[in-house]
């Protein structure tokens, strides 16, 4: 039996959805343990694209999929996503999909607060997706949140929600001069969601405990990336949850002894959406090439991603923060055609060489990358299915990543399709 955590090692958008979809074939259950619909997975199965924001990617494999207590859930987005999947023949039914009773609910006022706050920051915006994730986590920590278990008692839910909407209306009007929300309309809308989702609400921790007792395999699906972690990321240009592997336990209701390994997803180059320092960012034709060839637009926001060379400094730190046991390198095919590749092996800061990722964004923003040149390749690798069939230069690139990060490469993605993958070591084997 193996229980594997999949996490992003950069700033998100590493291709976790494809890898989770691939590994779901070997798992019995797939669990989301943090974040919300501010993250999106794009999957290509049999030439058909699926974009998922909340429902775990394993749903396409017919697996039991769970949303853990660490996720904040917008019921409007969730019900819409469930309906969209069903319309395409995917079985999203209570027997195959559950939401933790302890998961917090994103309310309409969370989204409004998110947007008006960001607008008020002017040039100091942090690049929020405006989906209410941060304000929902604030209410969770402030003990003012509503959870899915509250939806199971509709009279009490109506009362709690009405009280919260009125309180948040005062905040919106007095702090930002924003228009108040319609209390009755908002409550009626969410009561509708409660009635729809009631059959899907469950004790996810109990389900996972039973699965463990039965020797079933579990795949834990992280969202965003290591450097968007609220504690370990490039604060304040981060998300509102812990994205590192340790949160798989807290966010799903299991103990650390239940985990077998952690697979870190690494894009073969580096990308970032929104604001924040990015030492290896490219502003030349190579950066444009990566953006264009890699179709680097956010699945959730549609925003153009910033592109740059692979940063081994941040990857080595990510390996430590997550306890990585393996790497999955994605979008290796995008680098085809470049004569020379660069890997950042250290930073230069005020005349000193830094080998560790700094916690201070001001320091990071002033860091200059120290590059090591690696030979590129010209061969089309999109049809490669064995590591031995990769060009010598591509294999050397992967080997160098392993040497710099100290973690072996288990999987290599050479295209968007599920079958466009080289599996060197299966984490579930």
Swiss-Prot record:
Binding site for IMP: 13-16, 38-41, 129, 143, 224, 239, 303
Annotated catalysed reactions: IMP + L-aspartate + GTP = N(6)-(1,2-dicarboxyethyl)-AMP + GDP + phosphate + 2 H(+)
Cofactor(s) needed: Mg(2+)
Alphabetic keyword roster: Cytoplasm, GTP-binding, Ligase, Magnesium, Metal-binding, Nucleotide-binding, Purine biosynthesis
Cofactor-binding details, from the entry: Binds 1 Mg(2+) ion per subunit.
UniProt-annotated location(s): Cytoplasm
Active-site positions on this chain: 13 (proton acceptor), 41 (proton donor)
Regions that span the bilayer: none
Residues that coordinate or bind Mg(2+): 13, 40
Positions annotated to bind GTP: 12-18, 40-42, 305, 331-333, 413-415
One Gene Ontology term from the biological process aspect of the record: 'de novo' AMP biosynthetic process
Record PROSITE patterns: ADENYLOSUCCIN_SYN_1, ADENYLOSUCCIN_SYN_2
Gene Ontology CC, one term: cytoplasm
Pathway: Purine metabolism; AMP biosynthesis via de novo pathway; AMP from IMP: step 1/2
InterPro entries noted in UniProt: Adenylosuccin_syn_GTP-bd (IPR018220), Adenylosuccin_syn_Lys_AS (IPR033128), Adenylosuccinate_synth_dom1 (IPR042109), Adenylosuccinate_synth_dom2 (IPR042110), Adenylosuccinate_synth_dom3 (IPR042111), Adenylosuccinate_synthetase (IPR001114), P-loop_NTPase (IPR027417)
CDD domains listed in its UniProt record: AdSS
EC number: 6.3.4.4
Molecular function (Gene Ontology), one example: adenylosuccinate synthase activity
UniProt binding sites for substrate: 299-305
PANTHER family: ADENYLOSUCCINATE SYNTHETASE
Subunit structure: Homodimer.
Family annotation (HAMAP family): Adenylosucc_synth (MF_00011)
Family (UniProt): Belongs to the adenylosuccinate synthetase family.
Function: Plays an important role in the de novo pathway of purine nucleotide biosynthesis. Catalyzes the first committed step in the biosynthesis of AMP from IMP.
Protein name: Adenylosuccinate synthetase
Organism name: Desulfosudis oleivorans (strain DSM 6200 / JCM 39069 / Hxd3) (Desulfococcus oleovorans)
Gene this chain is encoded by: purA
């Amino acid at each position: 039996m193996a229980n594997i955590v999949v996490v992003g090692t950069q700033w998100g958008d590493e291709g976790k959805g494809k890898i989770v979809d691939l590994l779901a074939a070997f798992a019995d259950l797939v669990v989301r343990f943090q974040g919300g619909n501010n993250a999106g997975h794009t999957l290509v199965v049999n030439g058909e694209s699926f974009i998922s924001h909340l429902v775990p990617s394993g749903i396409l494999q017919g697996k039991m999929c769970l949303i853990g207590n660490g996720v904040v859930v917008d019921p409007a987005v969730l019900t819409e996503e469930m309906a969209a999947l069903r319309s395409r023949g995917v079985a999203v039914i209570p027997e195959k999909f559950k939401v933790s009773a302890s998961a917090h609910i994103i309310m309409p006022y969370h989204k409004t607060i998110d947007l008006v706050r960001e607008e008020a920051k002017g040039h100091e915006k942090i690049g929020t997706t405006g989906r209410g994730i941060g304000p929902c986590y604030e209410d969770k920590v402030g003990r003012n949140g509503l959870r899915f278990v509250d939806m199971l008692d509709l009279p009490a839910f109506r009362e709690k929600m009405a009280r919260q909407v009125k309180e948040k209306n005062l905040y919106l009007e007095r702090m930002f001069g924003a228009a108040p929300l319609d209390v009755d309309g908002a409550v009626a809308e969410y009561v509708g969601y409660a009635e729809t989702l009631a059959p899907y609400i469950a004790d996810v921790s109990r389900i996972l405990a039973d699965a463990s007792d039965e020797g079933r395999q579990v795949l834990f699906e992280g969202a965003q990336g290591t450097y968007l972690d609220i504690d370990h990321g490039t604060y304040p240009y981060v998300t509102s949850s812990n994205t590192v592997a340790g949160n798989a336990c807290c966010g799903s209701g299991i103990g650390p002894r239940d985990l077998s390994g952690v697979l870190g997803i690494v894009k073969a180059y580096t990308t970032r959406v929104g604001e924040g320092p990015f030492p290896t960012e490219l502003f030349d034709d190579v950066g444009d090439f990566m953006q264009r060839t890699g179709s680097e637009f956010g699945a959730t926001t549609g925003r153009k991603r910033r592109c740059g060379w692979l940063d081994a400094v941040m990857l080595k730190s990510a390996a430590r923060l997550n306890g990585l046991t393996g790497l999955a390198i994605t979008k290796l095919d995008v680098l085809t055609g470049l004569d020379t590749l660069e890997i950042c092996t250290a930073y230069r800061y005020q005349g000193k060489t830094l080998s560790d990722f700094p916690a201070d964004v001001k320091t990071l923003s002033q860091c200059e990358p120290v590059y090591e040149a690696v030979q590129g390749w010209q061969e089309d690798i999109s049809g490669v299915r064995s590591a031995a069939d990769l060009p010598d230069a591509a294999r050397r690139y992967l080997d160098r990543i392993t040497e710099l990060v100290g973690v072996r490469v288990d999987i290599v993605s050479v295209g968007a399709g599920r079958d466009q993958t080289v599996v060197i070591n299966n984490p579930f084997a």
